Structure formats: C-alpha cells, structure tokens
Amino acid sequence: QAGTRKKQVGMFFWLWQGYHYAHGQMNDAYDATKILEKYGADVLFRQDSSVSPAGQFHFWGEPLFGYYRSSDTWVMRKHLQMLTDAGVDFLVFDATNAYTYSDRVKELISVWYEYLKDGVNVPKLAFYTNTSSGDTMRRIYDEIYNNAALKKQYPRLDELWFNWNGKPMIVGRSAEADDTVKSYFTIKESTWPNAG
C-alpha cells in the first residue's frame, strides 16, 4: 500500500525558447533529432558547425505546436489546457543556469491568472536554481514574488505559487540564500547529476 499521503505531480518546465542564441528564425531552429538523422552523432555532439553550433540551444525534436517561442501566448494557453487536463499540480521553471526568464514568467502569469479567475485549478508555479543559486533566488524573489506592480495587477497572485510547508517552494542551495529568501521560501535543496 502506498500510504495515505497525498501525492502531487510536478513537471520541470523550460522557458528558453527564443532566448539566448536560439533567437533567429524559428524555421531554422536547431533540432537535435533531425541533425542526428541527417549528419550523425559527431556533428551533433563533437563538432562545432553551422548545422549544430556549440553553445546553441537545440530542440530535442519538433514540438507539437512547431518551433515556438516561449513568449507565444497561444502556446501557453494550449500548454495550460493540456497540463490542467492531465492533472499536473505544479510546474518548476528551469533557472538552473542563473537565467530567471522573468519577462516570460510574467507573460505566463497573465495567462494563468485569467484561468485562475475563471475557477480553473491551474498548475502552481515554482523555480529550480543551481548556478549562483543564492543570487538567482534573490532575483526571482525581487522580480516575481515581491514585485509590487505584479501584486497590484494580480491581487490573487499568491494563489499561483506552489507552497510547501506553508510557504512558496523554491529549489536552490540554502547555504547561499540570504535571510529574506530563507524567510519567504521553503527551500528544497538543489541536487545536480554530476555533483560529488
């Protein structure tokens, strides 16, 4: 028997599409599956070429809605619909490389908030930090959670946060967090695949 504890389903969620070096024409997006099929593993993994430049963000394959930008609100709505229909409880935004994607998060909040006001049980939101975790958690706090303009625009904003032990959850390194961050969030310790 699994026990009586309520289980929740969370998903890692990326907001990089259209950011960093992946900002050209989306019909020229770097698709790892197509590169591998056409050029082989050496071009995809070992060579720096115009087909698969090192340091460029790659799609693993063509997404259901095409090579979209994370700022596309139509795609956000479709994602929200599918995630809600699937019963996903929360999303964890990838901020592991110290990019907060705050403008994209704010756009996503505007879509999520519409549905929240209409009574939809939307997936709640959280962040995962790793690189420069303390600084990144503080920027997320300042730019999103403690943003006076956002709170004024969205009076029920706090209802969008995924809470753990009575406070919004964030994944990070608690040893790097300042007192404000430690007080505001429940910090779940960041783990990394290659960490010793």
Where are each of the predicted segments found?
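Glycan-processing catalytic domains of CAZymes
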Residues: Q1-G196
